Swiss-Prot record:
Single GO cellular component term: nucleus
GO BP: any one term: regulation of transcription by RNA polymerase II
Source organism (scientific name): Homo sapiens (Human)
Signal peptide stretch: none
Name of the molecule in the record: Zinc finger protein 627
Gene giving rise to this polypeptide: ZNF627
A GO MF term: RNA polymerase II transcription regulatory region sequence-specific DNA binding
Amino acid sequence: MDSVAFEDVAVNFTLEEWALLDPSQKNLYRDVMRETFRNLASVGKQWEDQNIEDPFKIPRRNISHIPERLCESKEGGQGEETFSQIPDGILNKKTPGVKPCESSVCGEVGMGPSSLNRHIRDHTGREPNEYQEYGKKSYTRNQCGRALSYHRSFPVRERTHPGGKPYDCKECGETFISLVSIRRHMLTHRGGVPYKCKVCGKAFDYPSLFRIHERSHTGEKPYECKQCGKAFSCSSYIRIHERTHTGDKPYECKQCGKAFSCSKYIRIHERTHTGEKPYECKQCGKAFRCASSVRSHERTHTGEKLFECKECGKALTCLASVRRHMIKHTGNGPYKCKVCGKAFDFPSSFRIHERTHTGEKPYDCKQCGKAFSCSSSFRKHERIHTGEKPYKCTKCGKAFSRSSYFRIHERTHTGEKPYECKQCGKAFSRSTYFRVHEKIHTGEKPYENPNPNASVVPVLS
């Protein structure tokens, strides 16, 4: 009868596949493997070689006799240890016929392989010889010259060497500030990336990231919220979304105590304290705290409008504008004014609106003393004093202090007339012209112009 190979009875995963499993699937895997170990122990089988390099994809091994220990530490020439990389929880004290891992340094038992790795490191100060993805130690710490073979070692070493660019490429010596950066850089030495999108050409070094990206083209959203039914393409997105229902905000600002549901939001918020604005508009030089803000702003220069209202067809530059606009049609919004019933999507917009009722104007101009209810109106006013005109026409060179004036001016070049009269079909480039025209049909005469030949339309600048 042929000898039994471990691969015949084991369920194998790649590292990326293991990362994609949810906790219940991982628990099921551990239960199955635990039962497998029990069965093998009961029939008197053991692995001859415990020096397994890959933590999940275990190569074919013959099983020949009863184990004294299924996990065994083997001390290397320089104090490095190698271990069977089986996930913690498969082997434990409750598994009959199986002895858990034992430390070669102090003799302590009762640990899983990963726990033993940490335990040995605490004794020796050295990293275990972990999983090798490409067959050599490609990443080094430039502060201490230490070679690290597997990216999970880095967060531990990160705390040892704060500041600077801690990741050093052994191939060319270039240094990097983050692990993500050096992983991308290593692709240049490996001759490109293994996973490339056929639709847009974007490349990925991990299949899990590639599969998530593909869903942006297919529209697949396998993760659905049980509370509201909203679907997501990635498991991390649904976890963040679920916090809107639970109210969980695990990320708290150390400066002001404000809490956030997502790490991305707190990083953006922290810039309000530091004053950091890393995203700059190439057209006018205006800086922003987050990438989405600069992208929305850049559309004021290009005139690009990606979003269209399904109700009225109005084109808008960003998703936030669409949400705000849709409230006009639906009348629904999480923040509703008790005085006039107007609804808002964001608390900041709601607070600004409330000031129209209270008369509060917290922003004072130091030049002329004029006060404003919101910071954006105040900034626009300041340009009257400074003469700043950040919006410049690429066609004729004329500059404007406000983006709205700039967009209106652009229509003189493009011929665009977005305001059309439903009565007679006549179109206009500006809403003021359109409103004046409508009164011809209604017969309304709200004011009388003493000089009919004079223009009543304000000059844009």
